[in-house]
A protein has these predicted regions:
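Conserved N-terminal boundary motif of the eukaryotic protein kinase catalytic domain
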Residues: 19-27
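Short beta-strand segments
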Residues: 53-57, 84-85, 153, 211-214, ...
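An alpha-helical support segment within catalytic cores of ATP-dependent transferases
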Residues: 4-18, 90-92, 102, 143-214, ...
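Short amphipathic alpha-helical segments and helix-helix/interface helices
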Residues: 12, 70-71, 138, 192, ...
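Short, surface-exposed alpha-helical segments at coil->helix boundaries
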Residues: 8-9, 67, 259, 263
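Helix-rich C-terminal or lid/interface subdomains of diverse kinases
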Residues: 61, 128, 132, 172, ...
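ATP-binding pocket architecture of kinase catalytic cores
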Residues: 26-164, 206
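Active-site acidic catalytic loop and adjacent metal/ATP-binding pocket
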Residues: 35-41, 54, 193-244
Length: 318
């Protein structure tokens, strides 16, 4: 992914132009493809003394989805930070603002800072007791009211999914431009086998239409060590089978220890039937294929190799 490298003074200038004087501006842990900072601003009305977060990204799309998710789905059982401002950083040196190709002026998104740390940053011995609260949060997420939304798969800031059915979303991974990935013959043979398995399993996957976060379980979940205090970054959110979120935990379990802990919890609690196992396999392969394609196009060789090997192992699980 292309990570922004916008100088802090440029970000402060954009915030002060929109919100007035900014105080306590400090960096936070970066996302995979974004920057993040905490701050306070006088122009936030009654919330002026509350801490806020500003994130910087080359695209606005994910920020608009964050705003949509906060307005539509936030409630006591599903804490989603309210978005207070979205804009562009105008004052910067373009050539030094990105790792990789130039994409134009980046966007910023200001949201209320929720308490807690990310699950990924939590000491591992504290993650186990959170497995049940995490599962309850996924249940709450899946129970969200989708009235006024349409479609399946990834949706836009208006709640419109890109596909007419869940099966269509799953099978669409084969329609990506795989020639642009420039994989060698051995890697492409593996991808073709995995695409065939997805096509074989997709018709048996239920046409459920519920809210799916799409990237749940590590840096996008906040906790105080007892409960879940925030679910953030809705850029990958979609409509479909909520088991897709569990499959994401399974796919990434070798990569992050906190995902392994959650995966083990669901291994103990999910139905032990062939249908559930087939859905998990299908969804993991789908997640992996998307990761392979994205990494190949971004030129991320190490991540690409990991994803290729991970998907090969999943494909071998009969």
């Amino acid at each position: 992914m292309t990570r922004t490298r916008v100088p802090a003074p440029s970000i402060v200038a954009a915030l002060e132009h929109a919100l007035g004087p900014v105080h306590g501006f400090v960096p936070l842990a970066e996302g995979e493809d974004s920057q993040a900072f905490a701050f306070r601003a006088e122009g936030l009305g009654s919330a002026a003394q509350a801490e806020h977060v500003v994130r910087i990204h080359r695209s606005r799309e994910g920020f608009d989805k964050d705003d949509f998710a906060a307005r539509r789905f936030a409630r006591p059982g599903l804490p989603v930070p309210a978005v207070t401002a979205i804009g562009r950083v105008e004052d910067l040196s373009f050539e030094q603002s990105f790792e990789g190709p130039f994409f134009g002026k980046p966007f910023y998104c200001v949201s209320r800072r929720l308490p807690g740390s990310t699950l990924q940053d939590l000491p591992l011995d504290l993650v186990g007791p959170l497995a049940a609260p995490l599962a309850r949060t996924l249940e709450e997420l899946a129970a969200s009211d989708l009235a006024g939304t349409t479609g399946f798969g990834r949706f836009d800031a208006n709640g419109t999914g890109a596909h007419a059915s869940w099966r269509a979303f799953l099978e669409a991974v084969a329609e990506r431009d795989w020639s642009a990935a420039r994989l060698d013959a051995q890697a492409m043979a593996g991808v073709e086998r995995q695409l065939a398995i997805v096509r074989e399993l997709a018709p048996s996957c239920p046409e459920l239409r519920q809210l799916v976060h799409g990237d749940f379980g590590s840096s996008n979940v906040l906790t105080d060590g007892r409960e879940i205090t925030g679910v953030i970054d809705w850029s990958e959110a979609l409509f479909g089978d909520p088991l897709y979120d569990v499959a994401n935990l399974f796919f990434w379990r070798p990569w992050l220890a906190c995902m392994e802990v959650q995966a083990r919890y669901f291994e103990r609690t999910l139905p032990a039937d062939a249908g559930t196992a087939a859905r998990l396999r299908c969804y993991q392969l789908h997640i992996g294929l998307r990761q392979i394609h994205d990494c190949a196009l971004a030129g991320e060789a190490e991540d690409l190799l990991w994803a290729l090997e991970r998907n090969a192992r999943i494909a071998d699980q009969a």
